[in-house]
Structure formats: structure tokens, C-alpha cells
Amino acid sequence: MTELSPKYNPAEVEAGRYQKWLDADVFKPSGDQKAKPYSIVIPPPNVTGKLHLGHAWDTTLQDIIIRQKRMQGFDTLWLPGMDHAGIATQAKVEERLREQGISRYDLGRDKFLDKVWEWKDEYATTIKEQWGKMGLSVDYSRERFTLDEGLSKAVRKVFVDLYKKGWIYRGEFIINWDPAARTALSDIEVIHKDVEGAFYHMNYMLEDGSRALQVATTRPETMFGDVAVAVNPEDPRYKDLIGKNVILPIVNKLIPIVGDEHADPEFGTGVVKITPAHDPNDFEVGQRHNLPQVNVMNDDGTMNELAGDFAGMDRFEARQATVAKLEELGALVNIEKRVHSVGHSERSGAVVEPRLSTQWFVKMDELAKQAMDNQETDDRVDFYPPRFNDTFLQWMENVHDWVISRQLWWGHQIPAWYNAEGEIYVGEEAPEGDDWTQDEDVLDTWFSSALWPFSTMGWPDTDVEDFKRYFPTSTLVTGYDIIFFWVSRMIFQSLEFTGRQPFQNVLIHGLIRDEEGRKMSKSLGNGIDPMDVIEKYGADSLRWFLSNGSAPGQDVRFSYEKMDASWNFINKIWNISRYILMNNEGLTLEDAESNVAKVAASEAGNVTDQWILHNLNETIAKVTENFDKFEFGVAGHILYNFIWEEFANWYVELTKEVLYSDNEAEKVITRSVLLYTLDKILRLLHPIMPFVTEEIYAQYAQGSIVTVDYPVVRPAFENEAAHKGVESLKDLIRAVRNARAEVNVAPSKPITILVKTADSELEDFFNSNINYIKCFTNPEKLEISSAIAAPELAMTSIITGAEIYLPLADLLNVEEELARLDKELAKWQKELDMVGKKLGNERFVANAKPEVVQKEKDKQADYQAKYDATQERIAEMKKIKS
């Protein structure tokens, strides 16, 4: 047995430990076929850069789960991997190339992809280093990447199978277009932000010049693609105009007036311009009325030749030029400034352009129905907290067909080929012959990520051992911001292709926010690098903070004050451990367990030993129960209270009465209970703080704590009588301590303590444990009896079953206390005078902010209460003196 360092130093404790775990292969599945499997697939981080604090939280929760299950005897697999993150990674690499004055087009597809693979290798290494710093117990022998050949095979099969069922199709529809990345986006890749904008009101003159129809738009540059104006067929103002024409300003061409319910008589003028190639609602109107589709923009957001004199302009430049021209022509009615919601690309930040484009889509109605129906079966996915099941169902009910093609080079190239005759071939392998050209687009990143739980296990080969044993997975841990992005897609793809749900449980956590509750972002400059936190506090402190502040579905506020508290807690554990191990005298864990069994059987030890074992039992039960519900924050509070309050502040202090005595037999029992309880504490803590628990465990036991048994409740430790008795003992000691503090009597000063109880069992208990009471209260005189009469002047405390009297004359030097109270009274009078003067100033009351005035009134009330209380104490002291 070695000795722990005098001071807890996380850098020393954590250095080299992770590699030792890897070398010992303790993170791999046990291979025990009799053990129940428990598997988690890591939500694959994007290879776009370093991991942030949100990743640290997400992976910490997973590691807590998998470490506990491993200790509980499950055959655990935590499968790591990373996501190629198509648009995000390509954007990062293009940005790096731009700094060198190079574009991807300069390099060509193959050489550009070589650069992206270099980027991937660089950041995959960084991410794995971060995982190691966090202590994540993943099985690297099964590491996956979404562009691995095995996963690519799964992607191709899913695409082809869905295509053959008619659930993947190619067509020309309005999609979200990112002009910066020059690619299509799905609805959920669009972030809507409120921005300062305007409604531009314009007049479209009837063909006969008799009147004008007023329309409004936020995007006047799209008017070159207008092919109609619509009115509601039931709107009496315009019914007679349906079928006539208006003149499109600037372009001077005739476009028809159509009747369509899309036009709302209650909104604006009730007339809307119809631009089918640039608005999803207008596209639907165009389909109903067989209107042409006129696309007036290039893929980079500039205007094309159909915009006439505005061709080549950026869309926002064209907007201003168009408005100026309308004003010049007298067609601009007015500009109405307004804040409105505008879609932005999640990745590039560019304003998204609704645009007619030929893309590949997944038909969602049947897939969504399967997912919703499954939630009514025993094979459903359980969400924690349950309210997110409703969120999931709502999204599924309102889902649209999913645009899956992306105009990128980095990703899974769509397995579709075209020939000169216009034929399309879709297959897992390329068609024979040289006259076929593969579709240049790639699939949406989420298409491959949706297959992650089963493709990583070997699917489509369903006979491989990992797929048979570890799929469906047990639990998914992820943030609420990607329930639709990812969780829902994994569910419907898994149900479609494996017939099973991808995971049994989904633990949803919130976001990491700063101390002010703001979301961390680059723009605010409030992001926190978890590696910086680890360097200062250690991984265990960060993990404890992330776990202890965690409740399913809730956000967490990061603060350095909380990190200080985390470090202090671990330092407390370190110091307790040092005390126990320094007093251990060579006792082995096996000997301790044997002696503790005697305590449980009341064959050895004392009531405090029985009390701590009873409370340890309760702690194990409550922590395990809350872990099973993923209530890690609740479990953390239970552990904290037991370790700091019950074990350190009470039991460890109580043991000093024995350890400093000459009774060797009692010392052995006390050391045994200390070591046994410490061992169970370390095992309970290990899933949360693996490094420090391994370091301490190694001082008294062989092997690694990673694979030891997790604590279980032992019925023999249940002892309500011991629990009730020691809790009463603690209440008595606390009451005396509080009374001393109230009248500023030092703990070192002996005092008279009178305990009156009519409960004979309690009286016997207190008297039989009187040494503990004396040790903690320092009495000059201590009486415990049912016959005690209450002194006339005494501080009185009432606890369950007893009254405690501390005679005031014994507690105080009356003359000194009166002098002190006189000074205190003068102090409160001075404060009252000052605040009274301020509140008596009419100008202050009239001109100061209401909250400032109220603050002064609150001060006045507080000072008055303190003044009155001090006067009462003076009266009491004078009564004692007389």
C-alpha cells in the first residue's frame, strides 16, 4: 500500500492513466455470453474541428452510463466514431484553400477530396486526444467513420431499396438553396432569424389601364419571375377580374389574374404575386393553374439573363436597383419597414433562397407513419424526459418530403447514373458500359447518420456477431436540438430496414449556456474550450460539474464558481481518503469486508458504525435508482450529501474517539468500516470521476476499479434503530452548536448542557453514547434525564423527543455582552438614520428609479428588525444581570 500525495493534483492523477486503461483492454466488451448486453453508439462528432463543451457534456453522460453498466456486470459496448459532415467540413476546407488563393474548382474533385481527407485525419486525431483527456471508455477497435466502406455499402443499399419502393424520387421542386455553399438544404438545416426588413408595396396595372392591383413582397428582385397574380375566388372586390391580365412593371409583359384560395382576403390587399420558381406556396399555386416556372437567379445568388438589365447583380444589389426602378416608373406605392423571419443556412450563414431545382427526395409519409405507429407498441423508443415523445410525434405528423441531394463533393456520391438517352440507372454498383455518368451530387450527411446505430454494427450483414448481440442499442444520449435532424431519422430508417427500433432509450439533454444563461456562440465570444477547463481543474472536476448539473431535457449554466466547487469536492474526497489510508495499518479490503459483516450482525462495532452502513445502503439504493432514470444530477446531490455531510463531517469525526483510544479491537472494526465505506463511495463515484477513483483505489486494492462490481444494497445493513438513534444524536449536537454560534460562545468554552426527554429509550441511548456528545459539545456539565426542570433563563432547543437547555448565565459574561450589544445598537441606529434621511428627501423619492427607492425601503426594514432584535437581547441581558 502506497501513500497518497499530500495535495490533490489532477494533472498528476490523470497523467498516463488513460493509456494504461487502453493497454489493459478494459473498455472492450467482456465477451461473456451469459451477461446481458448493453450498447451505446456515440453520436459521431463532425470532423470540422475541436470538440466544444456541449460534446464534453454529451460524452460524459454516455461514459457515466457505460461505466456503471460495465461495473454492474453487463457485456458493454460503447462504439466510437465520427461523421464526415458534408457541407460543414467542405466549407472549412474551402475556407482554408481560399486563404491560399485556391478554389475547389482549381483543384478538381479528386485533388480537392484528397485535401478534405487530410483535414479529416488531422481533426480525427485531435478529437480522439480530447476523448482521452475526458477519460471516455470507448472501444477503439470498433471505431467507425461515416465514409468507411462498410457504412458506404449500407448507404448505397438503403438508397437503392427505397428507390425501388418508390420512396426515393427525383424531381424539380422548390427547395432551400444556399447561394454561398451552392447546395440544396433540408428544412431543418435552415435557421430562422428575425431581421430588419421591409414590405415593398407595388402597383400592377390592369391590361386596360382602368385600375391597379396592389401587391406586397419582401423580395422584389424575384418579380422578374412573376407569372400571375392571385386573388381569392370568393373575394367580392376582385371576382370579376379573374381571367383578366395585369402588366408586370419593368418587364412590361402580361400575366394573368387567377382565382386561388392561397390569396387571403383578410391579409393586405388580398392580392398576391405568384412566382412559382422562387416561393413554395407560389409553386403549389402554379401547379394548380398550370403556370410556367421562371427561375431568375443563378446558383450563386446572382440574377440571370431573365432579369434583363439587372442580370449579373447580386440578389440584394438587384433588390435595391429594382425598387429604384419601380419608384422611377411610379409603380412603387410605399416601403413598410418591418422585422420578419428570414431563413439562414445553418452552416454558411447565408440567407437561404427558395429556388426551383432538380433534386433527389425521400418520400416521408409511409416512413413517418411507421415511426409513429411503433410508438404505440412494446417496441417503442422511451424518451427521457417523456415530453419529448410528443415533440417527436408532432414533427413526424408535420414532416415534409426530405431533400437528400447536396451539390457538394465531400460525401456519399448518389448511386445513380445517366446515359445520353436520358435513362437513369440506380444500383449499389456502377452499371456496365462506358456511356454511363454518375450523378455528381452527394447525399445529405443525415442520410448516412440515420443508419449509424445499425450500419456500425455490420448491417446489411445481419449475421455478424456485433449486429446480433448489440443491436438494437440500449441508450442514445443527445441534445434536444437534433431530435428531428437525427433521432427521428434513425428511428424510421431502423424500423424500415431492420424491423426494430435503433435504441431502447433516448436521453435528451439541453444546451450548455454561459453564466448569464446565453447560448454559447462564436459571435458572443462566450464559448468555453473543455480542454482549458481540464487543464485548470482536471477532467474529473469537469465531469462532476456536467453530471451534477444534469437533469433530462434541461440546460446547464457553466460557471467557474461551480468548477471551483467541483474541485473542492474532489479535494475533500482526496483528504478523507488520505486520512483513512494513513490510519489503515495494513488492513486489506477482504479483512474489512469480513469485519463489516460482524458489525451488520451486531457482533462488533458500535451504533455509529451501524448507522453509517445503514446510510450507505440507502445511498446505494437511491443513487442506483436515479442512475436508472438518468437523473444524474439527483444522484450527484445524494452522493455529495452522503460523502461530505454524513461520512466526512460526522462519521469520520466520530471515529476519532475510537482511533485515538487504546482499544485495539475497536480500532480494527472502525478502520474496517472506514475502508469498506470508502471503497463503496469510490465505486459509486467511479462512473462520474474515473481518474481520481482509480488513483485512490490502487492504494489499497489490486487490479482496476473499472471492472470491479458496482455496489448493491445489502439487507443486513438495514438498521432503523441505529439510524434513528444517531440522527437524534446529531440533532442534539447541532442544536448545541447552533446555540453557541447564536450568542458567539466559542466551541472551546465549556458550558452546561441539560437534556430533558420523556422517551426512556432515547434517554438510554444518549447516556450510552455520552462520550460522542461530550466530544462534539465540550460540556462543563452534561445531564440527560426526564426529571430535569427548565431553567428560568436559558436558550432552549427542541429536537424530536427531547428539549435542550443551555443556561444563559453559564454561556455569557453579561457585562461584556451588554457592552457589545450597546455598540451593535448604536451601529443599527446609525444605519437607520442614514437611510431615513435619504427616504425623507422628497427629491430623491420623486426622481430615483422605483427599484432604487424600494431597495432603500428594504434596507430600512432590515435595519429596523435588527435594531429591535438587539434591543430585545439587551433587555434579556439586563434581566439576567438583575
From Swiss-Prot:
Position of sequence motif 'HIGH' region: 45-55
Residue runs in coiled coils: 808-882
GO biological process: valyl-tRNA aminoacylation
Annotated InterPro entries: aa-tRNA-synth_I_CS, aa-tRNA-synth_Ia, Anticodon_Ia_Val, M/V/L/I-tRNA-synth_anticd-bd, Rossmann-like_a/b/a_fold, tRNA-bd_arm, tRNAsynth_Ia_anticodon-bd, Val-tRNA_synth_C_sf
Main localization, broad class: cytoplasm
GO terms, molecular function: aminoacyl-tRNA deacylase activity; ATP binding; valine-tRNA ligase activity
Substrates-to-products reaction catalysed: tRNA(Val) + L-valine + ATP = L-valyl-tRNA(Val) + AMP + diphosphate
Record flagged with keyword Iron-sulfur: no
Family according to the record: Belongs to the class-I aminoacyl-tRNA synthetase family. ValS type 1 subfamily.
Functional description taken from the UniProt entry: Catalyzes the attachment of valine to tRNA(Val). As ValRS can inadvertently accommodate and process structurally similar amino acids such as threonine, to avoid such errors, it has a 'posttransfer' editing activity that hydrolyzes mischarged Thr-tRNA(Val) in a tRNA-dependent manner.
Quaternary structure, from the entry: Monomer.
UniProt protein name: Valine--tRNA ligase
Gene assigned in the entry: valS
